[in-house]
């Protein structure tokens, strides 16, 4: 009677048996695998939220495979390979829960993941562009600036000579001066 209902404190409890391959050891503590955790978190979310979660999981899986995150933006073959590996892991986790409620969004989001996405804002922007009537942009495109420095544009529409960037406080920090300086 004195114990609050878990729903009141914002906790959702999902009880089920886990396949052994979806359990990992973290400092002696059994935890769900990255893929299973991502699938569980993405269930019942919006497509944008689900893709944010799956992009993050794909990056974690890439790092665990020894990939330097910087290379994901620069090496298209590596990026494709990491995406394929992440999708395989996530599909395996999805199959264990495919008959559960709220899994349709996971099935829709897995093909959209991109391990090179650097922030939730970038993931959300990519999904919004994909769901708009805009042509599909090239993603993470090297662009050489006037100084000769190479930058990587989040989105490029060559036919319009337009670059799209999805940057915010996650990249530049909360300090308004730093944000203004970086955006100049």
Describe the predicted segments one by one.
Residues 1-102:
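Short gly/ser-rich loop at a beta-strand->alpha-helix junction or flexible surface loop bordering the NTP-binding
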Residues 45, 65-184:
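Surface segments flanking catalytic/ligand-binding clefts of nucleic-acid enzymes
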């Amino acid at each position: 009677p004195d114990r609050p209902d878990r729903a009141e404190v914002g906790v959702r409890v999902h009880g089920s048996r886990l396949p052994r391959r979806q359990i990992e050891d973290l400092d002696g503590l059994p935890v769900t695998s990255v893929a299973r955790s991502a699938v569980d978190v993405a269930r019942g979310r919006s497509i944008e939220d689900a893709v944010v979660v799956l992009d993050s999981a794909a990056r974690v899986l890439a790092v665990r495979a020894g990939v330097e995150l910087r290379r994901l933006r620069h090496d298209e073959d590596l990026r494709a390979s990491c995406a394929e590996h992440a999708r395989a892991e996530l599909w395996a986790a999805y199959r264990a829960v495919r008959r559960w409620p709220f899994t349709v969004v996971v099935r829709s989001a897995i093909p959209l993941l991109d391990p090179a996405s650097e922030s939730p804002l970038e993931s959300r922007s990519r999904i919004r562009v994909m769901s708009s009537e805009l042509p599909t942009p090239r993603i993470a495109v090297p662009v050489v600036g006037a100084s000769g420095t190479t930058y990587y544009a989040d989105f490029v529409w060559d036919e319009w000579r337009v670059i799209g960037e999805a940057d915010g406080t996650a990249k530049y920090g909360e300090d308004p001066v730093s944000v203004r300086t970086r955006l100049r």
